Amino acid sequence: MSEFKNVTAVKKANVYFDGNVTSRTIIFEDGERKTLGIMLPGDYEFGTGDKEAMEILGGSMDVKLPGSDKFVTYKEGDTFMVPANSKFSLIVKEVADYCCSYIKE
């Protein structure tokens, strides 16, 4: 899906790592929440509350998921899942565009 309709966009940006990772939150009529963001090159670690589906819309990133000791490359068109209440690491070598979906379990 290349666009979302009938959503509320939160004006204030989510800014992480001194502005190297930014996103905007959108909320659907049913309460579902997603963020649309950009990551500049760098090494990052994020923690999750909810389960997350990370869809790569542009660029690529190397991802180390919980329970793994190696990085796997995800590129445009790929999606990876991150368990709730966990941490994952990223190595971004080029600007990456992403959509993160938060999944209530």
UniProtKB/Swiss-Prot annotation:
It catalyses: a purine D-ribonucleoside + phosphate = a purine nucleobase + alpha-D-ribose 1-phosphate; adenosine + phosphate = alpha-D-ribose 1-phosphate + adenine; cytidine + phosphate = cytosine + alpha-D-ribose 1-phosphate; guanosine + phosphate = alpha-D-ribose 1-phosphate + guanine. InterPro entries: Ppnp, RmlC-like_jellyroll, RmlC_Cupin_sf. Keywords: Glycosyltransferase, Transferase. SUPFAM superfamilies: RmlC-like cupins (SSF51182). Its EC number is 2.4.2.1, 2.4.2.2. The keyword Glycosyltransferase applies. GO terms for cellular component: cytosol. It is an enzyme of class 2 (transferase). Belongs to the nucleoside phosphorylase PpnP family. PANTHER family: PYRIMIDINE/PURINE NUCLEOSIDE PHOSPHORYLASE (PTHR36540), PYRIMIDINE_PURINE NUCLEOSIDE PHOSPHORYLASE (PTHR36540:SF1). This is Pyrimidine/purine nucleoside phosphorylase. It comes from Clostridium beijerinckii (strain ATCC 51743 / NCIMB 8052) (Clostridium acetobutylicum).
